[in-house]
């Protein structure tokens, strides 16, 4: 795929702690308790594995980032808009493109104008559903969905789906002459090679 959108607004399983504490000010024992108790509660509620985190109040530290993988967390979002459409360099310090109140339609139009699939643009919108009632602006997300929805050249994905796919891409191995491709991951991988669209199934060797 040449573009992707992360559904920050619809990703209800990303957790922010039991008490929404400012984690960088807490002892690490409290951080562990906050994350694991909230994970367990959400998993019991949804019947799914919760592997994402959003830093409450945007608060984190290098120590907290180092801790997260051992707690089953694969990625963590910060609330700092970048205005960019790039992949995260660090999944534990994942900055979105924009909040839904921050020039959303401008970013949508800019995103749709891109035509260089090799860059694999990522448009990440974040926000909270309660804000639409508070600000009386449901029309903002409705207009956005009308503009950007229903397109075949966009992959509409959750944070976890983007994270796991990009991790899987790193498990594609090539021969020195690039004639052989092997998908060592457990999911389908989409590639473009010499203008040809290639679908690599899990464990497949492409010749």
Regions found by a protein language model. Name each.
Residues 1-64, 69-74, 81-98, 121-129:
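Metal-dependent polysaccharide deacetylase catalytic core of the NodB/CE4 family, i.e.
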Residues 7, 65-68, 112-113, 142-146:
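Short amphipathic alpha-helical segments and helix-helix/interface helices
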Residues 43-44, 75-86, 109, 124-206:
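C-terminal domain-boundary segment and adjacent tail
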Residues 28-33, 105, 135-138:
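Non-membrane alpha-helical structural segments and their capping/turn regions in soluble enzymes
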Residues 99-114:
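A Trp-anchored, charged/polar loop motif used as the substrate-binding/catalytic surface
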Residues 62, 102, 134-135:
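Loop/helix-junction capping segments adjacent to catalytic residues or to phosphate/diphosphate-binding pockets
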């Amino acid at each position: 795929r040449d573009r992707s959108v992360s559904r920050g607004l619809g990703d209800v399983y990303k957790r922010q702690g039991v008490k929404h504490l400012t984690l960088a000010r807490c002892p690490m024992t409290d951080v562990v308790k906050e994350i694991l108790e909230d994970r367990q509660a959400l998993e019991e509620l949804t019947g799914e594995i919760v592997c994402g985190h959003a830093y409450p109040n945007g608060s984190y530290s290098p120590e907290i980032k180092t801790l997260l993988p051992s707690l089953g967390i694969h990625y963590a979002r910060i609330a700092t808009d970048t205005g960019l459409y790039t992949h995260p360099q660090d999944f534990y310090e994942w900055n979105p493109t924009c909040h839904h109140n921050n020039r959303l339609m401008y970013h949508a139009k800019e995103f749709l104008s891109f035509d260089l699939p090799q860059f694999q643009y990522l448009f990440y919108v974040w926000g909270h559903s309660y804000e639409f009632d508070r600000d009386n602006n449901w029309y903002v997300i409705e207009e956005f969905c009308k503009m950007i929805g229903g397109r075949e050249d966009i992959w509409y994905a959750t944070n976890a789906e983007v994270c796991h796919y990009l991790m899987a891409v790193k498990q594609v191995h090539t021969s020195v002459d690039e004639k052989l491709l092997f998908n060592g991951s457990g999911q389908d991988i989409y590639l473009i090679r010499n203008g040809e669209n290639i679908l690599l199934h899990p464990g497949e060797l492409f010749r």
